[in-house]
Structure formats: structure tokens, C-alpha cells
Amino acid sequence: MQNKSEDKSYVFVLKSLEGDGIVLTTSGISETVEPGQEKQVNLIFQNNSTYSLKSFGDLTFRFAIFDSNAKNQKGETDVFHIYPYGENKEVSYVFAPNDSVKPLDDNEIFEAVVTECKQDQFGDENVFFYLRNKTNKRLYINSDKGSVNGETRSTTRYFDVGPGQSLFGFITYQDLTIPEAEIKELQFNLRVQDVDNLAGGPLLDKTYTVTP
């Protein structure tokens, strides 16, 4: 990241990353860059078997940029694209469910399937899923509670998916002391709200059970 200003420091916040229009869940970016300075940042993805960054022909980054010394500002939005195979190449990812996916839910708000359950290099269990927003609303989805084999675990995650848009997301269970082979049941909740009407309460608040 490069701050071309001579006298202002800016905060760069990654609002979203999309691969061919599909929202991808990442570690996020929130970095302050001083005037005239550059900063290298790392964006972390969870490895999964459904896709890699090489699967997409168009990676779209949406940043909100704030003056670090100003208050109560909305921030300017900057959008840029990376075309791994060239801008005019006809490469576009399409999600094609295989026999290993497990249906999660199909209601008037969204359709979702579990694509994979596995532990990462830190020993945390992850439930990967694909979700399609069936509404004309921008949805804010969060998960803040869950369990592993009935033992309570935090699953704090936040997702934002636009009207008719799809999302690759994952739920993480941290600080596990249970070997992966002994995990029989994973539970988590999804609370779904209309971004433009958060005061109106949830459109859906439901607990799901997944067997790895």
C-alpha cells in the first residue's frame, strides 16, 4: 500500500474481496500508512478444497480509506482489480457442488451447503460453506456461539453479502483439546439481518448441526 499524500496519514480497511463476484472470507486488512510511505501487508486465506485464488479470473478488492486524524467520517471507497490471467481472458469461476457437499439450509433468505470440515495448522476446527443470498437485500450475517460435541465454543464470524450474491465463508472453533477424529458434532448459529434495517431485528436466527 502506498500513501501519496505529503501531509496526511491514512487508514486502509479492506471492506471486501470478491472472486468473480463471489465474496471470499479473509483475515482482513486494517493498516495505517504514514504520509509518503509504503507498507507491505499480508492477506490470509484458509486453505480449502473448493477453490484457490488461481480459480478466479477477476479478484476485486474494495477498500475504505480514512484520514487517521479525522473523526466521524464515512471514508472514501477505492476499488481495484487483479486479473491473474489477463483482463480479457475468459476465466470465470462457477461453483459446482460435488457428492461431498452437505445441504445446510434452503429457505426464502438463502441457500447454503457445507463444502468441508477440517482442522487447520493451528489445531482449530473449521466448517467451510457456500451461501447464496436469495433476496434483494444486503445481508449481514454473524455467528457468535457454537459447540463441539456439546461443549460450548465461541464461533465469532461476520459476513456481508449483497443482493443475489454468493459467499464462501467458514466458521472456526478455537482452542480445541479434542482430536479431529473424535469430533462427532459441530453446532453454530447464524443470525441474519438486513443491513439497511438493523433495528428491525433478525430475518433469521437459527442453530445448525453439522457432522464432519
Predicted regions mapped to residue ranges:
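Short, hydrophobic/aromatic beta-strand segments
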Residues: 7-15, 55, 137-145, 183
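Short, solvent-exposed, Trp/other aromatic-anchored flexible loops in extracytoplasmic proteins
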Residues: 23-76, 124, 150-200
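Short, solvent-exposed loop/turn segments enriched in Ser/Thr/Gly
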Residues: 122-128
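Low-complexity, acidic Ser/Thr/Pro/Gly-rich terminal tails and inter-domain linkers that flank the onset
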Residues: 89-121
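Asparagine-centered strand-capping/turn motif at beta-strand->loop junctions
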Residues: 1-7, 130-136
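Extended low-complexity, serine/threonine- and proline-enriched intrinsically disordered segments
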Residues: 13-23, 143-152
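Short beta-strand elements
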Residues: 73-94, 201-212
